[in-house]
């Protein structure tokens, strides 16, 4: 899933942010292009326009485009809240129905108050096309998935798209995964260093295996290393909701991939989640304590590598299930 999100972010950075130079002319303070006989000069900002707010404050929407994207973001959050209250198999259709209603209302209100003029029309058309592209990309990412996984795929893609679009308009949007991870209860963060160490052990074991066996070796090694580094209390790591969701999402991302690339997909997806958690933990406690915990975990987990590699065909313990049902982890709002 993380691999997919990185791809989405790169694609959207080009497809959604790129566009005609005059797309956001009003926002950056320039008027219509000057004629050949007249040098181009900056125009005065539109009435009521204010620059982006300082870091840490939520920028206030002032332009029509900013107001529209804020309404879209509000609809997104309302849809996530609605989906949270229904069974997993109904989350996707609930989200789509709720978000669709909110989006249609936002667009209708925008059209009813749309200012006249070629520049404004061009700017609104560009924003509308970007939002349309975001919806289509999110829908495409969810095609062919199970009802449970479809919701996660759709929301993950759409949240990235809205975040990038809102960023170009200097207004707040859905929080990125790295920020959301910080919401993990402090009491559970002590396990993250051990999980990080287990990941490194499993990756080392997988790197020495043939391409077609890397995924299976990594699964078995990761499972055994988790057990070793937590003193046998394997289930304790499952009490970290974000990690549990990340593991399931990472596994779901590999279902339709070839054996030779399954390992890369899974490893990259899980690495992103664990790295974000580790960074959040390091910011929350002294560096010395982090180093001591991580070093001890690596030593305990290393002993599991030999056995894990020899049992490359073993099932992936507690986190590999017959039908992965990822939960909305990194893109909670």
Swiss-Prot record:
InterPro entries: Poa_pIX/Phl_pVI, Pollen_allergen/Os. Sequence repeats lie at residues 309-320, 321-332. CDD domains: Allergen_V_VI. Keywords: Allergen, Repeat, Signal. It holds the Pfam family Pollen_allerg_2. Gene3D superfamilies: Group V grass pollen allergen. SUPFAM superfamilies: Group V grass pollen allergen (SSF81736). Residues 1-23 form the signal peptide. Pollen. Residues 309-332 are annotated as: 2 X 12 AA tandem repeats. Belongs to the Poa p IX/Phl p VI allergen family. Its C-terminus might be membrane-associated. This is Pollen allergen KBG 41. It comes from Poa pratensis. The lineage of its organism: Eukaryota, Viridiplantae, Streptophyta, Embryophyta, Tracheophyta.
């Amino acid at each position: 899933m993380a691999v997919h999100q990185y791809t989405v972010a790169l694609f959207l950075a080009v497809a959604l942010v790129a566009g005609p130079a005059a797309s956001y002319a009003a926002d950056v303070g320039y008027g219509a292009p000057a004629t050949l006989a007249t040098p181009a000069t900056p125009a005065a900002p539109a009435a009521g326009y204010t620059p982006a707010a300082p870091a840490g404050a939520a920028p206030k929407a002032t332009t029509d485009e900013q107001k529209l994207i804020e309404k879209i973001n509000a609809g997104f959050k309302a849809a996530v809240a609605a989906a949270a209250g229904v069974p997993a198999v109904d989350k996707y259709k609930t989200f789509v129905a709720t978000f669709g209603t909110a989006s249609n209302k936002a667009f209708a209100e925008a059209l009813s108050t749309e200012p006249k003029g070629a520049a404004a029309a061009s700017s609104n058309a560009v924003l509308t096309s970007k939002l349309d592209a975001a919806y289509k990309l999110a829908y495409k990412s969810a095609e062919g998935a199970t009802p449970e996984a479809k919701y996660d795929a759709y929301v993950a893609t759409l949240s990235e798209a809205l975040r990038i679009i809102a960023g170009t308009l200097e207004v707040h949007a859905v929080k990125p995964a790295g920020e959301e991870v910080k919401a993990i209860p402090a009491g559970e963060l002590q396990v993250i260093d051990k999980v990080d160490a287990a990941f490194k052990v499993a990756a080392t074991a997988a790197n020495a295996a043939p391409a077609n066996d890397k995924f299976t070796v990594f699964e078995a090694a990761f499972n055994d290393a988790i057990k070793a580094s937590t003193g046998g209390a394997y289930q304790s790591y499952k009490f970290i909701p974000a990690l549990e969701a990340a593991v399931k999402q990472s596994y779901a991302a590999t279902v339709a991939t070839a054996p030779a690339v399954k390992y890369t997909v899974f490893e990259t997806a899980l690495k992103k989640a664990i790295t974000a958690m580790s960074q959040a933990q390091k910011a929350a406690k002294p560096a010395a304590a982090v180093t001591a915990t991580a070093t001890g975990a690596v030593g305990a987990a290393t002993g599991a590598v030999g056995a894990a590699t020899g049992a490359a065909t073993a099932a992936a313990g507690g986190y590999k299930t017959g039908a992965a049902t990822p939960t909305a982890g990194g893109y909670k709002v």
